[in-house]
Amino acid sequence: IDLRNYGQSDIVSAYEDLGLKSYNDVLGAFDYLKHIGFKSNKIGLHGISLGAVPAIFAAYEEPAIKAIWADSTLAEFNMVLKDEIGRYGLSIEFGPVVSFVGQRLSGVDPSDLNPVKKLSNDQSYFFTHGDKDERMFVSHFEYFKSFTKKNNIKASFWLAEDSYHVDAMFKYPEIYADKMQKFFIENLK
């Protein structure tokens, strides 16, 4: 799932839904794959950037999904809000206003955008991130790492050196592919 260019499934009114509804598309694809003969324990998800949000949310809704690879994604809405407000040089006091306006315009509550709270002890995750990511700061990666350790959630991590946002797959394609292959082979049995 890659929502960096957004798709028609994510449009609510004239605004993007931050992946909060598109997890239903992922569940539809999961059901379709089962319908054409794939076993549910052989279907994993790979989400890139914002695309990891619906992948994580879909896995939360469908426990049969056992392996989720999340590349350069966000952990919690409040972290993103703080990052984005800071990026534009605004005071954090603008946060509630930005959140409220976003909810009114899009029809979705951005405070529901908390993938870290959708992680399960019954699934396996792989989080990768670029150490120089300026779009989605490394603090999100570190938060996932801390949260999964604290909550005994099965997760692996790779902080790709000298890499920016969703850059590791291009900068280190062989390593990326090898790690991904091993992760899915190990967790889709």
Identify the role of each PLM range.
Residues 57-108, 123:
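Hydrolase active-site cap/lid region
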Residues 16-37:
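Alpha/beta-hydrolase active-site loop
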Residues 37-49:
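Alpha/beta-hydrolase fold nucleophile elbow
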Residues 1-11:
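Conserved alpha/beta-hydrolase
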Residues 47-57:
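Glycine-rich nucleophile elbow surrounding the catalytic serine of serine-hydrolase chemistry
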Residues 119-122, 126-129, 133:
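Short beta-strand/loop motif that positions the catalytic acidic residue
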Residues 134-140:
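Conserved alpha/beta-hydrolase "acid-adjacent" motif
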Residues 142-189:
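C-terminal catalytic histidine-bearing segment of alpha/beta-hydrolase fold enzymes
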